[in-house]
Amino acid sequence: MRLAAVIMLAALLVVPSAEAWRTTGTQWHSGTIRVANIAPDFEWPLQQAVAAWNASGAHVRFVRVPRAQAQVVVGARLDAGDEDEAGLAEMQTVNGWIRSGTVYIRSGTPRYAAAQIFAHELGHILGLGHENRACATMNSMLQGDHPFRCAAPPPGTWRCGLVTKDDASAAAHLYGGTPRAQAHEFCSVRG
């Protein structure tokens, strides 16, 4: 009987959390992050990603500003290095606080994939880590035009629900707020 109780307790201790998100141990001191886009051809995908994070329910906002006022520069070209790398976020931190960052994206990335990549890289800018146990914004790779472990969009649509509720929960954990699910998971490519 005692052995059964120990086994049951051990099983309870290894059950994974319902929330699959991960953080990096860093975050912004302020809930407002000033962002500048230096790649005009990526304006639409960046707008989609910023709007998705700003609607996530976390008490953090990306605000668009001129480059001279930016804490984060988005749209730097990722043209060398790992051919499998579609995007990259770099942050400068001091004592666990993120001070600035740069988001890189590969030239020629199609706009719907670019929106996914920007949402993912802005997640890193917020302090989120990779999450591959479930469908998440922070999955470490794309499969075509959608994150790993996420359902492929039906024909004629794209995955416009750029921030999953699980990732919104991670941001709310860091910045406060109540995570909200995106209004739509898929949207028509015709607008």
Region locations from a protein language model:
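Bacterial N-terminal signal peptides
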Residues: A4-V15
